[in-house]
Each structure stands twice: as C-alpha cells, then as structure tokens.
C-alpha cells in the first residue's frame, strides 16, 4: 500500500535516509544483506514518515523531528537484526555471521544512545526501554509459543508507532490527559497500517475508525 506524503515530507525522508546510511557507511557491504531483507517490510517503509508526522503535528523543530525519525529507523533496524538470530533448537549456527549480527545490532543500539545525547533527548530512554522490552517479548512469543499474526504485530511492530506519538507528546509538554489520547492515536494508527499491510482489512476497520475518533477528540 502506498501513502501520499507532502513534498516537504519527502525531502525530510530523504534526509533521514542520508543520516541512516552515513552512520552505517563503514560497514555498508556487510549490512546490505540485512537491508535487503527489509525491502518489503511494511514497518520499515512507513515508520519514518509516521514519526515525522507525529512530531510535526506537535509543532516540534524540523531538524529535531528528522533526528528522531532516524533514531526510530535505527532502533527498528537493530531490533530486526537481533530478531533474526535463532537459538540452538532452531538450528542457529555459531559462526562469524552470527557474531557480526550480534555486534552490529549492539553497535546500532549504542549509536541510538549517542544520537539521543547529541539532541539532548536522553530523557526519552524511559519510553524506549519499555518499548524494546515489549518487542523482545513479542519476538520470543512469536518463535516459542506460535501466537497469532495479529498478536505478533501488536507486540513487535505497533509499540514503535505508539512510542513515537508518546515521545512527541511529552516533548511538546502535553497534559497527561492529552498525552494519553495522543499515544492511543499512535497505537490505533499503527495497528491500522500494519493490519492493512498484512491483508487483515476487516480487522483494520475498527482501528481506522478509532484513529479518526481519537484525532477528532484530540483536535
């Protein structure tokens, strides 16, 4: 599914991609195999634009919004790399590829921390850490307990969207009541996008309706 972005947002997305690629340039040949795996990944495609939109709607600085979109892009990349590492029961081979997967994933997490320091936003770690824990829990449930596809999306994808809205709302100093609404908007929007992208159109209808209602309530 294609989403229509304004011309300005398209330019900002290009800048996010430039920042992302520049940081990984020393390992470009090594990480290409991971990036190829994300070519058709719906979250990979849509998350940066959603983050930018969430931050712009709060009236936050453009350069800061771009930096945050890059941070979320890096977080999702690192989480994806780590999620592809299997355990012994799943036939994981202990070789250089495994070592690099772990190292590059850890490096990117460290890079995210540096980016937060650079923009003086380390306070957001209190929101990122629970998000990462939820995603990790979702990956474990996915591989060990065979939960439904929708439950997997709720645990491993949607927390990125809701956290984007919550962090934007906190930085904009929303009241607790309005912050809760804005976070719910991010959650429902994320569920709608991910369900539509994974051909769960009927299940997405309620989340689309709730997103519209929350947007109207917030506005």
What kind of feature is each model-predicted range?
Residues 1-219:
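All-alpha prenyltransferase/terpene-synthase fold signal
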């Amino acid at each position: 599914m294609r989403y229509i972005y304004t011309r300005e947002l398209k330019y900002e997305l290009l800048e996010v991609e430039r920042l992302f690629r520049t940081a990984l340039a020393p390992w470009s040949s090594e990480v290409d195999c991971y990036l190829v795996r994300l070519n058709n990944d719906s979250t990979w495609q849509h998350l940066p634009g959603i983050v930018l939109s969430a931050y712009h709607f709060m009236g936050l600085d453009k350069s800061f919004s771009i930096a945050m979109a890059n941070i979320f892009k890096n977080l999702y990349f690192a989480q994806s790399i780590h999620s592809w590492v299997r355990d012994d029961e799943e036939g994981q081979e202990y070789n250089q590829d495994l070592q690099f997967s772990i190292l590059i994933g850890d490096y990117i997490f460290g890079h995210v921390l540096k980016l937060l320091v650079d923009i003086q936003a380390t306070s957001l770690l209190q929101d990122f850490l629970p998000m990462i824990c939820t995603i990790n829990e979702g990956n474990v449930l996915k591989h060990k307990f065979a939960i439904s596809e929708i439950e997997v999306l709720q645990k491993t994808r949607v927390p990125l969207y809701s956290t984007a809205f919550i962090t934007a709302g906190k930085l904009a100093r929303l009241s607790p009541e309005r912050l809760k609404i804005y976070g719910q908007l991010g959650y429902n929007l994320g569920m709608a996008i991910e369900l539509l992208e994974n051909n769960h159109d009927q299940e997405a209808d309620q989340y689309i309706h709730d997103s519209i209602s929350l947007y109207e309530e917030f506005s």
